[in-house]
UniProtKB/Swiss-Prot annotation:
The gene is bioD. The active site is at 38. The lineage of its organism: Bacteria, Bacillati, Bacillota, Clostridia, Eubacteriales. SUPFAM superfamilies: P-loop containing nucleoside triphosphate hydrolases (SSF52540). Belongs to the dethiobiotin synthetase family. InterPro entries: DTB_synth_BioD, P-loop_NTPase. The keyword Phosphoprotein does not apply. Homodimer. Its main location: cytoplasm. Its cofactor is Mg(2+). It comes from the Bacteria. It is found in: Cytoplasm. HAMAP family: BioD. Its EC number is 6.3.3.3. This is ATP-dependent dethiobiotin synthetase BioD.
């Protein structure tokens, strides 16, 4: 049985792709066949006339996954806007059926699958014929989540609000990961202490520009669930 997890965040440009890549890299270095999938990607780069799914390409490079990164993304858009707006601008109808089919294909090639979200947890994927929010994908895949948050000022508010929204949607959260953490920054230190003391889930940190997660692979795989 394949096991999976979903990586979401408190907002855009928090570092989901960076953290996702480090998680997949850690597991693959532990000889675990871990793959990657993303339903919709915006802000793709066009090279020689072809759109390149930058987030997937980054994860594939860091985690040493073979193959075409574009195969790990169902919908790829050039405009750096929300997926629902990108789809509208390109006259594309996003389909949950295609997302499920593509996810199933990628999932069945691996023992573990790490799914990256788009933007923060409240992200419209499609407002066309099908109304699809990010949480619809998470629940459809039956995945627990990891929430990536910035370690700096304001993260207590954004993290707790994100967790409240996720709880309302009946999605399980396994841990919080504070990105861009500085062990000498009093704000970062206090944010971690407060969240650790007031949340029922573990709070981990990742130093800025780190090439490795300090979380052991054995601990990471405990957060993945059978899907």
């Amino acid at each position: 049985m394949v096991k999976g997890i979903f990586i979401t965040a408190t907002g855009t440009d928090i570092g989901k792709t960076y953290i996702t890549a480090l998680i997949v890299k850690k597991l693959r270095e532990f000889n675990i066949n871990c793959g990657y999938y993303k339903a919709a990607l915006s802000g793709a780069e066009r090279i020689d006339g072809k759109l390149i799914a930058g987030d997937a390409n980054y994860v594939y490079n860091i985690a040493d996954i073979k193959g075409d990164p574009n195969d790990a993304v169902s919908y790829i858009f050039e405009q750096a806007v929300s997926p629902h707006l990108a789809a509208k601008l390109n006259n594309v109808e996003i389909s949950m059926e295609k997302i499920k089919k593509d996810f199933s294909y990628i999932k069945n090639k691996h023992d573990y699958i790490t799914v990256e979200g788009s933007g923060g947890i409240i992200c419209p994927i499609s407002m066309g014929k099908e109304k699809i929010m990010l949480e619809n994908i998470i629940k459809s895949f039956k995945l627990p989540a990891i929430v990536v948050a910035d370690a700096g000022l304001g993260t207590i508010n954004s993290t707790i609000l994100t967790l409240q929204y996720i709880k309302e949607k009946n999605i399980s959260v396994k841990m919080i990961l504070l990105n861009n953490y500085n062990h000498e920054d009093i704000i970062h230190i206090e944010n971690k202490r407060y969240l650790s003391d007031n949340l029922p889930i573990p709070v981990y940190t990742c130093n800025k520009n780190s090439n490795n997660l300090e979380i052991p692979a054995e601990k990471l795989i405990e957060y993945y669930e059978e899907i």
